Every structure is written in C-alpha cells, then in structure tokens.
Amino acid sequence: MIARKARALTAVLIFTLSIPGPSVFAGPGAPPVEIVLKIRYESLHGGRILPMLYGGFVELLDDLVPGMWAEMLGDRGFEGVLPTSTWDYFRGEPNLCDRDWDKSPDWSRDAARPFNDRQSCRLDVRAGVPARLTQSGLAVRKGMDYPVTGHWRGDSPSLRVRLSLKTLLPDGSWMTLAALDLSKPGPEWGKFAGELRSNGTTDRAVFEVEARGQGHLWLDQLSLMPGDNVDGWRRDVVEAMKELGPPVVRWGGSTVDPGPYRWSDALGDRDLRPSFVNRVWGRRDTNDVGVEEFVRLCRAVGAEPLVCVSLGDGVESARRMVEYLNGPAGSEWGRKRATNGRAEPYGVRYWQVGNEIDSPGYVQSLVAFARAVRGADPGAVVLSSFPTKELIDIAAPDIQIVCPHYYQPDLDGVEADLRKIEGWIRDSAGRDRIRMGVTEWNIDAGNWGLGRGKLNSLGCAIFEARFLNVLHRHSDFVVLACRSNMTNSFSGGTIQTNAAGLYRTPSFLVMAMYRNHSRPVPLRVAADVPAVVDVTACASEDRSGATVFIVNAGKEPARVALDLSDFGPGFAVRGGEVVKDAQERGQVDIINSFADPARIVRVKIDKPSGNVVTIPALSIAAIDCGR
C-alpha cells in the first residue's frame, strides 16, 4: 500500500474517498424490495471462480505485524521507539508497536559494547537499593507459561537478578504473578533463558527486571512470549486466520519496495538481526519477522505465500531469495536455509516483482527478474507490479499474472478498468496464459484520521461484498486477489488485535462467508434489481449445488424469490448464511469492537418459505441451493 498520499497509475487506481453514500445505500423509509431472480443453468463465461480470489495481505505496516507476532516486549533491543506514521489513529489509542520501556533513573541506553545493533540497556545498581527495568501494558493468562530469554553481562560478582510479572492492585499494592531468579551474569555477553508461569489473568501486567548488589548490569535482546505461540505467531491470530481461510497471503508492500527492508537481514537467529528504520511508516522495525517467518505462518494457516521481491535490491538478490526459500539444501542459499534449521525447501510458488513500481525501465527490469526467478525455480509463477499494454506485450513470454491495485469505492470504475486490461490481454500474444491478480484492494488507502474507523464498519463490509461480486463476474481473467490488510493497519485489517485478544471485523465475516460458500462455475442471473441490490451466483462443476450471493445495501429488507427451474425438479433453497447487524438498526457505520465483538454477526438464514428468502436490510447473504 502506498503511504502518505494517494497515487493514480495506469490501471492502478488508488483514491481517497468516503464510504459510498445515497447512490449505494438507500435512505430510511425506502419501500420494501421485491425481487425475482432466475438462476440460469448456464455459465457466465468460460472461467472459474477460484478460491485464490479470497486472499489476504501482510506487510510491515506499523501495527500490522506487531499485532500478529507473539513477542510481548516492545523495543526488546533497546534501540529506541520512533513515532509511527503521521496518520491519526482512528481510535486515538496507542498501537502495539508503540510500547516503550517505562522511564526510570535506574536505567539508560548505552552504546558501549552492545550485544547486537547500536545500543543495549544499562542498569545502575547501588548498594542496598534495587534497580528496576519495567515495561507495562502486558496481558497474561492464568496458568500460561511465558518463556523469557535475553543477553546480559555484569561488572560485579555481587549482582543478583530477578525477573517477574506483576500487577498493581486497587489498594496500591503489587501482586507478583510469576518470578524467576537468575544466576550471576558474567563479564562477557551470555544468554539466559527461563520461564514465567502466571498465577493470574490481567491486561495490566508489568514485566520487571530487578537487580540487587552493586555495579552495572547490561541487558540486550530481551524476549517474552506466551508458551502457546505458533512458530512465534500469536495462537489466537493463527486460529482466526484458519477460520478466515485465505488461500493465498501476500508479503510485500511499500516497506519492501522501495523501502529500506532487506530480506537477507531477517534470517537466522532473531537476536542477531539488525533493526531498521521503516522510512515509509515511521517506526523502527526489529526485523524479528522476515520472509521465512511469513512463509511458516502461511503454512500454519493453510495458505499459499505470495512474496514480493524488491526491484531496488537487484536481480541477484531476487535469485538468492528464491534459492533460499525453494532451492535444494545443497545449493549455496539452500545451505544457509538448512543452517538456519530448515533442510526442506519451502516451495513458494508465487513471486511478484516489485510493489507499485511504474518507472520507465520497469518492463525491461521485469523480464530480467522473471528470468532470474524462474531460473532459480522453473515452477515459479511470476507476477508484475502493475499492468500496462506495453508491459503485457513485451513481458508476455516471461510472466503469468499482471496486477492492478484498487483502493476506491467506485466499482463501475473498477469494472471499466478490468475490462480495459482484459482487452490488452486478448490482443496480446499471451492471451491464453496471462491473467490478472488484484494483489491489493480495499475501499481506501488514504489518511482519513478518525474517519478511517469506517474501514471496520458494516458499510465497508457491504462494499467489499460488492467488490467480490465484481471479481466473480470477471473471474475468467481475475484469478487471484489479496484484500488489504490482515490485521490492524489503522483499522484496515480484517482482524483487530490488542495485547489481550482480538475481534473479527464485519469484513472478516464477509470474506470468510464468501470463501466457505463460493463454487467454481459462475452462473448467469436474469433479474431486474434495484441499485441497492447486487447479485452473483455460482455452481459446482456437476451443477448439483449452487450458491447465490445477495448484497442488500438498502435500509429495507429485500424479499427475494429464486427461480431455480433450470436445474430441474427438486432443486431448491437449502439454507445459507447472512452477515448483518445483530440489532438491525439500519445504520451503515455500526462496527464490532473489543467491548462488543459480536454487534455484526454471521448467522444462519431463517428457514426459507419454499424458494423465497428475506434478506435483511444492510446485509450480505449466501444462499445455498441443491437437491
């Protein structure tokens, strides 16, 4: 996603606009909608609705990865916390990646002999007075083990160190939730490891390092994680992603290209990785999460990884990355992977060259990159950074997918742009093999300030369902899409997290419902529907079952009669689901939240009366039909 300002590229539409208004959402008092839909036993076109249309996106954007990664300590390497993006926080709350160490005269950052990077922490311990380093705002659960590690050194044999988790009680006293006494630090850097088991549950826990004796204690690369993490990722996020079911997840964005991120810096022992300043989004990134951690996340949730390679790093860097992830253990970079603990190749299939790069020399660079990527892995599928007619004409023999990005509510404009790109493909030598992948999409990418909270709303979910219907109608050419973003992201994520938990946004519910109910064959639908209603239908290959997706953006229910006679006797509505406001208040700005995570719900459709179904106002429905 492009930061700071909106951009407009050829076939890459990124606008800053509001949630659709009256032209899409019918006003209060609109008459009830009566609709007859005839579902044709006829394919809309020769293409298929592929599961890959329901993908997601992960990038090093501010609070996105910190909200998924299980590390509980901020600034664990003591390099200093930098302000994040200048965008206003939509809730006015600090993000997870903003957590700093509590201020105290007991400790300071020291540039002399750090274990890693530029600085470490120095605790000044005076005789008879304990020195403390603390970090507040942590969430812990009763009975959970929290592995803790770090690197330390000291200049006095009198030093004694205790690690603890504590919480402040209403009476002003402190309750110790867990404690661990460490052995003495030596004069050179060494690693300590232990475990803290919490005897209570709170979202107001404090991690504390307490040193007694006399002298100086240095600490670096401290880490505290819940014991139930999944390869370093938060278990609750992993489980939510499994429920969401994205078949593909993209790794990339502005940080990767043209940003300062270097994939090879984020390999191996994370305590030894250099941090970097993310100039695009403003924060200092620890590099704890690199492409290898991302690929393992994808494998854990059953998704295919789609990896962006940096144009700025050059062709050889791209070749090395492919070899690192996919090469045999005997290859140069495959050996490095094996040394880091993974002998078997990861088998990453999808590779995108750059992110929203439209420089004059890009087409020639794309060809060189594509040949290098496929030279390292002949089975690789290569995606472009953006689509133009020139790119398709020149690069057709070397790539498989061209990729527009859409951040706008004008779906007529999106469809017009898709048709334009389809025309370029039809007119090219690659007409039989080139297809499209919308590798980023949402209603907006710009700076709304507090208005960005609308990205969490029912109104945005209704827009996203209509966008998915557009993809269904163009699925003969669009074979892959990645909704932006997976978590947090200034309200843009389908999953919103804090230190203690998460909730699923209305968009999450829509994406999961489409993923679970869609079928491969797009069908023709004969109907005269009002502008507030959007319909697509799809069937299984043998036509034994069908699903009708209905988006009702009106503020009155829609009574829908389905004509399924083309499918023969006994073919009828069998059930389905609907995403709606649990209170049915007729408001598009309703959201889920930590206080009320189930205001927008995904529920079973009321028992149909024959083939007649009532779709609630401001809702999205998936109606399943069969014998």
Where are these regions (language model features)?
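Extracellular and organelle-lumenal recognition/adhesion modules and their flexible linkers in secreted
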Residues: 25-287, 304, 308, 312-313, ...
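Hydrophobic faces of well-ordered beta-strands that scaffold small-molecule active sites
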Residues: 53-58, 249-251, 305-308, 349-353, ...
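Aromatic/acidic polysaccharide-binding cleft in carbohydrate-active enzymes
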Residues: 55, 60-61, 434-544
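Conserved, mostly hydrophobic/aromatic
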Residues: 56, 150, 245, 298, ...
